[in-house]
Amino acid sequence: MSNEGKPLQLTESKKIDAKSGEKEKALSLVVGQIERNFGKGSIMRLGDASKMRVETISTGALTLDLALGGGYPKGRVIEVYGPESSGKTTLTLHAIAEIQRNGGVAAFVDAEHALDPVYAASLGVDVENLLVSQPDTGEMALEIVDQLIRSAAVDLVVVDSVAALTPRSEIEGEMGDHSVGAQARLMSQAMRKITGNIGKSGCTVIFLNQLRLKIGITYGNPETTTGGNALKFYASVRLDIRRIQTLKRGTEEYGIRAKVKVAKNKVAPPFRIAEFDILFGKGISTLGCLLDLADETNVVTRKGAWYSYEGDNIGQGRDNTITWLEQNPESKEIIEKLVKEKLTEGSEVSANSMRPLASAARQASSRPNLSQVSANG
């Protein structure tokens, strides 16, 4: 009985092999035809792609880098939105400074005509080599963005802001004229046009956006962003930034505490939250971010108001501890290295808690060592 079934099985397997061979041949023919018509690289197997992992740009805040899965993704569209004076422009200026430090070229399309070069320079931006455009119309701004992207010579383009991209028809019209949906149509057309070029050139484009309130909304969130829905769909990352606290020394205000929620992320888990300090005239407090994560991962321990490192008290209160980190750069480097090591240990966490990587690292540090367990056993 079993011997009679073997020839039938062999015949079936030969048929399957022949069929798969024909399909593979047809596939290679059609791929070759597409490449001849549209150029090399117009279609490929994903495993053959030269860059599988998405490269990132640091945001300037270690906590936000972790929430984003490394930083801003290169070659993608990013939207940063929030209320006034929440830190939107500061975030993008730090990204520009990071790009320039690594030898890249950045451009700032200042549709609001509000860029402060002195403040930008204080954040580390090389204002001498920063490309700046102050366009008259929304069409002009987006055409400039498209040409910069297609040049493949620019690594980062910042548009400040979508709300200020006024269509030509509105500028040439009179006050009070209704131009319903003109800005949304402009943004939709621009997104369709520039998205393909962004992927090819590897240029990152950050759009800053403002908030508006929907009229007549009783339930749910009445807030929305300007420029229609196109940017929401085309953006790989959307960041919602809010001011949650004003930092004071006595009666003097010296900064704000910002909270960023990753509202959308196509390259890492979304809905993570990061907090950091923005100091007036100085930008994001990198040492403040480091201290927060060192506390989360138990590299630096806190008892009451005192912070201690390796059993020694290093500062009473957060401000004094940050000052100690400034005055001891060697210890700061060691603490930063230890924090990153612990975060790497706990990087497989899947929960979207406030600081998931840090909380996982804390669990990893409290877990007993297997060698110690076996020795004690």
From Swiss-Prot:
NCBIfam families (alphabetical): tigrfam_recA (TIGR02012)
Family as reported in the entry's similarity comment: Belongs to the RecA family.
Single Gene Ontology MF annotation: damaged DNA binding
Annotated spans, Disordered: 345-377
A single BP term in Gene Ontology: DNA recombination
Protein's UniProt name: Protein RecA
Keywords: ATP-binding, Cytoplasm, DNA damage, DNA recombination, DNA repair, DNA-binding, Nucleotide-binding, SOS response
Organism: Prochlorococcus marinus (strain NATL2A)
Subcellular location: Cytoplasm
